[in-house]
Amino acid sequence: QPNIRKPSEVMKLERMGSFHPSRLSFSRILIRKMIQQKTRISCSRWKMDKNGFGNAVYQLNLFGKNLALIAFSNHIETSQRTDRVIASAWDTSFALFDGVPSISDIERLKTQLPFQEAGRYKNTELVLSRANKSVRMFELVAQSLSEGKQPPSELINDIGYLMRTTAVYGNGKFGIDDRKNHSDLSDFSVPFQLEMLTVYLIRGFSLDLVNHIAKARNPKKFVPLDKKIQRYLGIGNATGLGMAPFLVKHPVLLNNWFQVRETALSRMIDLAELSKEKAERLIELTFRVKAFINSWNTDDDRQKKRIDILKAEWVSLINEFTLEKLLKINALKNIFNGSKNYSTECQELIVSLFLEVGGDL
């Protein structure tokens, strides 16, 4: 039985809200699978006008299964653009499709997807989603590229995405496919893999769309968005409205997720000796973490204070991550026990750091 932290310690809202992404996060699991499978994504259809309105299809094969993202980009009035759940129009709408879509599939979804919940769907649709542009960011990036220059780094750091999803629906919602009916989807049994794949593809679509619009404005001066900036940009998420009731209604599922995370942490803490390779990797990651948290921006005063405290704590904590100290007996256990003197944000960042080098465990 692993020596894991007590539920009374872990299952506190303050601590849960302080969790950081780790190698056990759903999106990270998906990316590892795609790398292992050497997945290639191709844009098989791009029917966009000069203003970026139209449709596109992205195809890929994962675990021997053909999948496609069908994307629609539509003009909407500024007054219609809202991230609230009561919205009835969005800049873009998407479906993750089971197989290779035909022209008739695309035409059918063209009349349904923009209506989202009000549309009618078949079991070939695995996931539905919609997204709005970050208008200020999207327009500034498009205009900069059309003038032959890269967008200002300050804006990229401040916002960090071109589009934000306002919903991602899967697993039987609104008449789409219920995955329990498909044994050939067993490789996607880890929670939210298809949803995360959809969001990953939407992110790629947003980059292609801004490049397309910029080039259409000024083909002679246009330069594509720098690859480093493309790698930095993510995808925004406007709401988390369904998260609270989902967690309340699925306690066993929540327990399983936490059990995996805490078990993995206990295996790392219980390592009597750390290999030199792992120690060097940890040292490298501590400096990457420092650069990462220094780039964080938020308008929330409470969270800003927490981040400021975390920044100061991390500068102090880095002194514990030397090769000499990490190669001592029970080094990780000593660091972890010592972290209890730091903020919850810092404690949970250390958890993610430890997990990062423990993939073989």
Residue spans for each PLM region:
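Charged, amphipathic alpha-helical stretches
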Residues: Q1-D49
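Amphipathic, interaction-prone secondary-structure segments
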Residues: I29-W90
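Mixed-charge, Lys/Arg-enriched low-complexity segments
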Residues: Q1-L13, A89-L361
